[in-house]
Curated annotation (Swiss-Prot):
UniProt cross-references to SUPFAM superfamilies, sorted A to Z: Tim10-like
Record family assignment: Belongs to the small Tim family.
Protein name: Mitochondrial import inner membrane translocase subunit tim10
Stretches that traverse the bilayer: none
Keyword Secreted: no
A GO biological process held by the record: protein insertion into mitochondrial inner membrane
Comment on protein domains: The twin CX3C motif contains 4 conserved Cys residues that form 2 disulfide bonds in the mitochondrial intermembrane space. However, during the transit of tim10 from cytoplasm into mitochondrion, the Cys residues probably coordinate zinc, thereby preventing folding and allowing its transfer across mitochondrial outer membrane.
Function: Mitochondrial intermembrane chaperone that participates in the import and insertion of multi-pass transmembrane proteins into the mitochondrial inner membrane. Also required for the transfer of beta-barrel precursors from the TOM complex to the sorting and assembly machinery (SAM complex) of the outer membrane. Acts as a chaperone-like protein that protects the hydrophobic precursors from aggregation and guide them through the mitochondrial intermembrane space.
Cellular location(s): Mitochondrion inner membrane
Organism of origin: Neurospora crassa (strain ATCC 24698 / 74-OR23-1A / CBS 708.71 / DSM 1257 / FGSC 987)
Length: 90
């Protein structure tokens, strides 16, 4: 009744969904680190610590990366709901 006719996922399916989500988050983090490092940190590594400019650049880059990711996720969710789908293959 409350599941809207869909069977409840099994424990194995729940674990697989969490593992998949973790994989997606890890891949997103890797992409963000790679992109922001290439953009913000000089290849010559003059100092052991980040300069103020590098630190600010990395902070802004990461914020923009996550903001863009959120906007894309929201748009995909709206499009999926508009088509009447319940989710990404689930």
């Amino acid at each position: 009744m409350f599941g809207l006719g869909r069977p409840q996922p099994t424990s194995a399916e729940k674990i697989a969904a969490v593992e998949n989500e973790l994989k997606v988050v890890a891949e997103m983090h890797s992409r963000m680190v790679k992109i922001c490092t290439l953009k913000c940190i000089d290849k010559s590594y003059r100092e052991g610590d980040l300069s103020k400019g590098e630190s600010v650049c990395l902070d802004r880059c990461a914020a923009k990366f996550f903001e863009t990711h959120q906007k894309i996720s929201d748009q995909l969710q709206k499009e999926t709901q508009a088509r009447g789908g319940g989710g990404f293959g689930m």
